[in-house]
């Protein structure tokens, strides 16, 4: 049956980690434009392969969003032609003051804006939905290159880009564990909210942090 292999190839079901030919050296951080996925298909497969290896929720829907969803920002790190890190951010906020008040009052839930809406609705901070921000959707580092500060460097570069773009903050939502909380705090993020109940999908409390 040729259909199943075709679908697997089309949706990158069988993508694995990029091969780490050399592990000595310094990773170079670079931005990725959505158009690069078409001009450099190997970059797409390596980027998606890193995400799949690190995030069990990564799905074909994420692949679709990588290709054509608006408001996405991508960056990566590379050493000796091996992709060592991948970072995916989503634009949030920028709502009108009127809509932000509706979110704060619980009457409106516009699509997206996970952290911005949560801070407005649950933390009593409607201004969070007005401010312009970017949320870390996915971040992954190749296992052969971990504990070298690559994730921290990717985030630091995006902080600088956000400042240059006039954004107000970066954010992240994650299932709380002491290790993950420490990772985000070491990157400069400050914890701003923890849910009162554990998530069924992860068994962890949902935490939110901003930079």
Across the structure, where does each feature detected by a protein language model lie?
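Terminal substrate-recognition subdomain of acyl/acetyltransferases
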Residues: 1-56, 71, 76, 94-139, ...
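C-terminal helical "lid" subdomain and adjoining coupling/linker elements of P-loop NTPases
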Residues: 59-72
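Conserved beta-hairpin
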Residues: 71-90
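Glycine-centered flexibility sites
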Residues: 85, 147-151, 188
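Intrinsic low-complexity, intrinsically disordered segments enriched in polar/basic residues
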Residues: 88-91, 108, 153
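Short coil/turn motifs at secondary-structure junctions
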Residues: 92-94, 144
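Conserved acetyl-CoA-binding loop-helix of GNAT-fold acetyltransferases
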Residues: 138-141, 146-162
């Amino acid at each position: 049956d040729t259909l199943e292999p075709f679908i697997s190839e089309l949706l990158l079901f069988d993508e694995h980690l990029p091969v780490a030919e050399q592990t000595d050296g310094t990773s170079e951080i670079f931005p990725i434009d959505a158009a690069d996925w078409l001009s450099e298909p190997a970059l797409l497969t390596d980027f998606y392969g890193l995400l799949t290896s690190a995030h069990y929720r990564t799905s074909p829907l994420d692949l679709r969003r990588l290709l054509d969803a608006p408001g996405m920002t991508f960056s990566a790190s590379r050493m000796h032609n091996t992709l060592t890190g991948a970072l995916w951010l989503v634009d949030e906020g920028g709502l009108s003051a009127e809509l932000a008040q509706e979110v704060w009052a619980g009457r409106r839930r516009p699509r997206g804006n996970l952290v911005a809406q949560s801070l407005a609705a649950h933390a009593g901070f409607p201004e969070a939905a007005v401010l312009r921000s970017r949320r870390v959707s996915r971040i992954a580092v190749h296992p052969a290159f971990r504990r070298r500060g690559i994730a921290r460097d990717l985030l630091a570069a995006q902080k600088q880009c956000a400042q240059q773009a006039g954004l107000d903050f970066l954010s992240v939502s994650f299932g709380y564990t002491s290790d993950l909380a420490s990772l985000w705090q070491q990157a400069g993020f400050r914890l701003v909210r923890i849910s009162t109940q554990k998530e069924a999908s992860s068994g962890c409390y949902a935490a939110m942090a901003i930079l």
